[in-house]
Amino acid sequence: LSPNARALQQYIVETYPGVQSIGGVRPDSRPDHPSGHALDIMIGSDMGLGDAINADIQSQTGRFGVRYTMWRVASHFNHVHVTVA
């Protein structure tokens, strides 16, 4: 993982104990995951947790170098996708 992704992952683990798992580097046709600049924060069916995490990340874009998040769109209903610089 990139330094920003690693820092965000650690923050999420420490702040949100309800998170089921966090995916990072994996093969994909887009470069974000293979390059280690994306996380998938798995929240299962807890939409409130996903809302809280997404809002928190959006409020700290500078801290983690957030480029964008995906939540409640395009099959992102059981996890929050975050791409960082």
Named regions from a protein language model:
Residues 1-80, 84:
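Secreted/periplasmic proteins that engage bacterial cell-wall peptidoglycan
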